[in-house]
A protein has these predicted regions:
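N-terminal glycine-/serine-/threonine-rich beta1-alpha1-beta2 phosphate-ribose binding loop
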Residues: 1-73
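Substrate-binding/catalytic subdomain of NAD(P)-dependent oxidoreductase enzymes
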Residues: 155-253, 258-260, 279
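Flexible, glycine/charged-enriched surface loops at secondary-structure junctions
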Residues: 10-13, 170-173, 194-202, 224-225, ...
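Glycine-rich phosphate/pyrophosphate-binding beta-alpha loops
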Residues: 269-271, 275-281
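Rossmann-like NAD(P)H-binding beta-loop-alpha module
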Residues: 97-178, 185
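Rossmann-fold NAD(P)-binding glycine/threonine-rich loop
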Residues: 57-73, 80-121
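A conserved regulatory-domain signal marking ACT and ACT-like small-molecule sensing domains
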Residues: 286, 291-401
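A short hydrophobic/small-residue beta-strand
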Residues: 76-78, 358
Length: 401
């Protein structure tokens, strides 16, 4: 599709010469005539006529081996493999730099949204302050359905699997791992730090109930799983967790399986990038964009290319990624407490003792929460900013009530 447009943009023809797939019959049917289909990917890497290898296998295992072999053979690489780059990016980018080849990965983050190019090139003049994004369509679909239909997580997950929005094993999505892979890559590009997935704080949506969605709405918020990375005086925050977003914000109204990324730069202010974060066509759009970039720069000196992580390798920052215990932010608490006098005073006393101030509070009648005759009720508290370590201390005391 759009071959003429692509040729006009690239300035040279780009030809698919070989495809490797264990199911060669399926691959041949998809590739069409004139394309050599093999079962062994190393045959593609070994072909001296091939300039660019596209890796769409996924995972850390054979994909890593093949990417490193392609780089060692002097081939440029295009990949959509966020997990591979988030975990092994430092090794892969160093190998690419050594061998003078490019590794392009627009499709690894937010599918059809060109957020990597925006961060690496479009916002070059800016000092990036923070990034916050809905970067996993599965969890955004689940949270949207929980809000719209008032259903619990487990029920909506099954529906998401039936519709094809969630994998048979959805762990990476619902536990926040997929979003953390993407946030790790954006953080490295935004702040010029090595990829450090092992230092990211990762929390998924499995502990959220329908009542949390309802209470957030009553307080004027919507719950979104956000990937957040932020520059602070002490270091870089890198975290994924459910977040309360004011309902009037544009990003709060990103529904279904769509993605959106907000970027704050000192010159441009807040910018928002929105679109399809997954799917065959959005992914293909990003892969082809990378192919065109490499075709334009094929043969160019390394100094004329955009560095993999936007900053020159010798200029990477040593700013630390902060542990979550040092992050300062506000909190949503849902406490299921005894419906009796004095409990509220104890809770507020614990928070005050930890130096945590309350921004807003809801208290439900016990029969609203557990039905007639219930003796437990929900106490919902929004706090002002405080350090996570203090909140953890306060939570430990409240759990003992």
């Amino acid at each position: 599709r759009n071959q003429e447009e692509i040729f006009r943009r690239a300035g040279r023809s780009i030809e698919i010469a070989m495809v490797a797939d264990l199911d060669t019959t399926r691959a041949q049917a998809a590739a069409g005539p004139g394309v050599t289909v093999v079962a062994d990917a190393r045959a593609v890497i070994a072909n001296p006529e091939i300039d660019i290898i596209i890796e769409l296998i996924g995972g850390y295992g054979i994909a890593k081996q093949l990417v490193l072999e392609a780089i060692a053979a002097g081939k440029h690489v295009v990949t959509a493999n966020k997990a591979l780059l988030a975990v092994h990016g430092t090794e892969i980018f160093a190998a690419a730099h050594k061998h003078g080849v490019m590794v392009a990965f627009e499709a690894a983050v937010a599918g059809g949204i060109p957020i990597i190019k925006a961060l690496r090139e479009g916002l070059t003049a800016n000092r990036i302050e923070w990034i916050a994004g809905i970067i996993n369509g599965t969890t955004n679909f689940i949270l949207s359905e929980m809000r719209d239909k008032g259903l619990d997580f487990d029920v909506v997950l099954k529906e998401a699997q039936r519709l094809g929005y969630a994998e048979a094993d959805p762990t990476f999505d619902i536990e926040g791992v997929d979003a953390a892979h993407k946030a790790t890559l954006m953080s490295a590009i935004a702040f010029g730090i090595p990829v450090q997935f092992d230092k990211a704080y990762v929390e998924g949506i499995t502990k959220l109930g329908a009542q949390d969605i309802k209470y957030a709405e009553q307080l004027g918020y919507r719950i979104k799983l956000l990937g957040i990375t932020k520059r602070t005086a002490k270091g870089i925050e890198l975290r994924v967790h459910p977040s309360l977003v004011p309902a009037k914000r544009l990003i709060a109204n990103v529904e279904g399986a769509m993605n959106a990324v907000m970027v704050q730069g000192d010159a441009v202010g807040t910018t928002l990038y929105y679109g399809k974060g997954a799917g065959s066509e959005p992914t293909a759009s990003a892969v082809i964009a990378d192919l065109v970039d490499i075709a334009r720069l094929h043969g160019a000196e390394a100094a004329q290319r955009v560095p993999h992580l936007a900053f020159q390798p010798q200029s990477m920052s040593d700013m630390p990624v902060l542990p979550m215990s040092e992050v300062v932010t506000s909190y949503y608490l849902r406490l299921n407490v005894a419906d009796e006098a004095g409990v509220l005073a104890k809770v507020t006393g614990i928070l005050a003792g930890a130096g945590i101030s309350i921004d807003a509070m809801l208290q439900r009648e016990a029969d609203e929460v557990g039905g007639e005759g219930a003796t437990q009720t929900d106490l919902i508290i929004l706090t002002h900013d405080c350090v996570e370590a203090k909140m953890n201390e306060a939570m430990a005391q409240m759990q003992a009530l």
